[in-house]
Amino acid sequence: MYRFTKDPAYLNLARNIAKFLLNHPNLPADKVPYWDFNAPDIPNAKRDVSAASIMASALLELSLYTSGKESKNYVSTSADILQVLSGPAYRAKPGTNGGFILEHSVGHLPGNSEIDVPLTYADYYFIEALQRYKKWAL
């Protein structure tokens, strides 16, 4: 919203959301979130690469509207997430996974739907984040 309105309240909200996510005690070291930060079975809870992809892309955009150490931290964290998602734990081997790039997303675990599967929007935000990183951070 800040990009379109330039209302500082939206920028402040985005910064607070980023702070909440990045400092959450249940965010794993590789920064690929569990399907729910309060899942009762952490650390054995399913991971959600769609959430990680969205977070990487959003942090890159947020880096454009912040400066100094804060901006660099958002870029660096996004780079770390993209590196992890590009690795063997989360990226599908070519010719597998129905043509999707990423594995291990969770859509709606309580509804027993889309659990540990590829999701279109995970790949979408992963590609968006890669493009943003290439354009804005390299």
Task: Please report, for each region that a protein language model flagged, where it lies by residue.
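Glycan-recognition and catalytic cores of secretory/periplasmic carbohydrate-active enzymes
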Residues: 1-138
